[in-house]
Structures are given as structure tokens and as C-alpha cells.
Amino acid sequence: MNACINPYPYPAEISFNKAFNVGRLLHDSSAKNWIKEWHIKENLVAVQCFPLYSILLALNQTTVDFFSLDVEGDELQVLKTIPFDKVNIKMITVEYVHQTGTVDELNQFMVGKGYEPLIRMHKDDGTVTDVIYSKKS
């Protein structure tokens, strides 16, 4: 499937900036400002994006053992589209470095959805900036 995870709860065609390991959707002003702040050259392509829940339903798979989310800044917005009462994701790794908001806001959201942060991983060079969450039993 050639598609992306949509930060909105509906399908849409969105511009994606191809930029090696920091490519991202350009769907709002904060994403566009991020591209400018990081001095990233624009190299746009239109991509079809779907909410994660729609993809899981199409695959008839609403239980996920492990989900890694790294979308260069839209992590919390993507998580907010997931109906956690209808999907059983047992463990989630979320990159937090490029997102709008703080890691504390991310933790607060995930705890509110029934998850506990297990570990916050961080390397000073920025290559590892993730939190691992486990669903509470």
C-alpha cells in the first residue's frame, strides 16, 4: 500500500516533502514553518493518506502487538485519530522530538488512553528520541 498515515480522521490527498530522513506531510502552517526553520529544500509529491484506523479495518486487524510512530512532528495528532476503545494496540513507540507540544503532553494523552510510559529514549545527537508505552492490563 503506497499511502501515509493521516493526521486527520478522514482520507485525504496531502503534499509530502521528500527530505531524506526528515520527510513529512505539509498539511498546515506549523509543518510548513518547520520546513523553513530546518532549512529543508522543498521537494513535494502528492500522497494519499488514511487514518490508521481505516487501514487497520481494511486489513481486518484491530489488534496490534507493536506500533512504531515516527512521522516527523504529527505524532500526537495521528494518535488523536485512533479510537483506542476499538483498537487494541499493546505497545507503542512514539518519536517526540519534532512534534508540536511537549513530551509531557504526549505522556498525559497516552496515560489518559490507558497506557504507561515504560522508557524515554534520548541520544544527544538526536538520532533516538522516542517514548515506549505499554497498554495497562
Q: Where do the language-model regions lie?
A:
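Phosphate/nucleotide-binding beta-alpha loop and adjacent structural elements of enzyme active sites
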Residues: M1-S137
